């Protein structure tokens, strides 16, 4: 194997929705309806996984678990997870379009990848209706990945590798090592690693910083540098082979991975 064949991007915080704001907005509103204040940090803790799994993880947080007991009179169980998940979905759909702006440089990097003969895939923790809505919004802005897979399609989400492997099968790639997974969360990194692919973290546009483009640009240079370094360290600790600030900076990383593949290296 001498070269890369495909790149798989995440959605919120990587290619759309600078700061990954939509899922935080919907999740905090969901728990507020039950009198539970969910902090942004708690909402972001397990970002990137399938939203039903995400709700389950939030309920298991000690503070949230205590609050749930106090307000409901008992412990939560899978019936409550399903109830919350069903209530979450329309909440997420309501805010999705408002946070669907394609992150700067995404369309251009996709064009460059296609120019190199690479396929472009995408995975997400969103449901199929949510993903379809994002696909429509992104296409109107010029971003059209060649494949888009969600947990509904595979029976499970991150950190399991199934979505990435389904795309690899659809693209008929020669080996998982010929694919690069790019995302802004720890679960993105683990998804790529578990699939046997190269994992590239995105530090400043996504969940680890959690800021809109306008808020990010309003920071002083030293503030941006500090937040970027902190996000980079977290993604590196999750196992990322590389970390970039935004997807528009992916080209040099791909060149290095191509060289490593040609030298016989694997992820």
Write out the residue ranges for each language-model feature.
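Asp-based, Mg2+/Mn2+-dependent phosphohydrolase catalytic module
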Residues: 1-5, 107-115, 127-267
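Glycine- and other small-residue-rich loops at beta-strand/loop junctions that grip anionic moieties
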Residues: 99, 123, 156
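A structural preference for short, hydrophobic beta-strand core positions in alpha/beta folds
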Residues: 40, 122, 243-245
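N-terminal helical cap/lid subdomain that shapes the substrate entry/recognition surface
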Residues: 2-116, 132
């Amino acid at each position: 194997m001498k070269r890369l064949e495909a790149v798989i991007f995440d959605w919120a915080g990587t290619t759309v929705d600078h700061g990954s704001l939509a899922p935080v907005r919907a999740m905090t509103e969901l728990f507020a309806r039950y009198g539970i204040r969910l902090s942004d940090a708690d909402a972001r803790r397990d970002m990137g996984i399938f939203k039903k799994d995400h709700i389950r993880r939030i309920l298991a947080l000690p503070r949230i678990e205590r609050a749930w007991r106090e307000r409901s009179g008992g412990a939560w169980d899978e019936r409550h997870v399903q109830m919350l998940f069903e209530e979450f979905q329309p909440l997420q759909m309501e805010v999705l379009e408002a946070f669907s702006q394609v992150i700067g440089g995404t369309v251009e990097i996709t064009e460059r990848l296609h120019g190199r003969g690479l396929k472009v895939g995408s995975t997400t923790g969103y449901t199929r209706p949510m993903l379809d809505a994002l696909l429509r919004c992104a296409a109107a802005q010029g971003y059209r990945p060649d494949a888009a897979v969600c947990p509904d399609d595979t029976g499970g989400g991150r950190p399991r590798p199934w979505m990435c492997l389904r795309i690899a099968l659809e693209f008929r790639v020669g080996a998982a090592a010929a694919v690069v997974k790019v995302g802004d969360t720890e679960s993105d990194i683990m998804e790529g690693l578990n699939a046997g692919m190269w994992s590239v973290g995105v530090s400043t546009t996504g969940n680890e910083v959690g800021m809109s483009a306008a808020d990010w640009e309003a920071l002083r240079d030293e503030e941006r540098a500090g937040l970027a370094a902190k996000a980079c360290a977290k993604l590196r600790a999750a196992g990322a082979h590389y970390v970039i600030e935004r997807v528009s900076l992916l080209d040099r990383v791909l060149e290095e991975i191509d060289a490593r593949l040609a030298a016989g290296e694997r992820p």
